[in-house]
Design a protein with these regions (language model features):
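Active-site-flanking beta-strand signature of metal-NTP-handling nucleotidyl enzymes
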Residues: 2-8, 50
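Structural beta->alpha junctions
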Residues: 9-13, 56
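Residue-level signal for secondary-structure boundary sites
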Residues: 14, 59-61, 96
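Short amphipathic alpha-helical segments
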Residues: 14-39
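An amphipathic, aromatic/His-enriched active-site/gating alpha helix that lines ligand/cofactor pockets
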Residues: 31-37, 54-90
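Short, low-order "capping/linker" segments at domain edges
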Residues: 90-102
Length: 102
C-alpha cells in the first residue's frame, strides 16, 4: 500500500476557505476517481493541512498522477494562485501493528 501525502501551508487569512474547498469539493472529486481506497484530511495548526491518499498499488497512484492530477492541480491553482505552499510525498507502508482495545 502507498500513501500519497500532500501538505498545505496556508496564509492564515485563507485557511478557512482552503479547508472548505478541500472538504467540500477537492477531496470528494479525487475520491470519485476510484484511484484511492481511503483519503484522510488532517490539520496540524490553524493554517497547516495534510491530505493522505491511500492507494492499493503503484498502478493506482500512477493512474491518478497521469490521468487526473494535472486537472486537479490546475483547478486548485486557479482557485488559490497564491498564499500557500504545497509539498507532496509518496510513502510506502512497511508494517502495521494492530491496535488493541483497552
Amino acid at each position: 500500500m502507498l500513501l500519497y501525502e500532500v501538505t498545505l501551508q496556508v496564509e492564515p487569512a485563507l485557511a478557512q476557505k482552503v479547508e472548505n474547498y478541500m472538504r467540500g469539493r477537492h477531496i470528494p472529486e479525487i475520491f470519485a476517481t476510484g484511484c484511492f481506497r481511503r483519503i484522510r484530511f488532517d490539520r496540524a495548526s490553524p493554517a497547516r493541512f495534510r491530505t493522505s491518499y491511500q492507494a492499493d498499488s503503484q498502478a493506482d497512484l500512477d493512474r491518478y498522477l497521469q490521468d487526473h492530477a494535472p486537472k486537479f492541480r490546475a483547478e486548485f491553482h486557479r482557485d488559490f494562485p497564491e498564499g500557500l505552499r504545497v509539498t507532496r510525498e509518496v510513502w510506502m507502508q512497511q508494517q502495521v501493528w494492530p491496535q488493541s482495545d483497552p
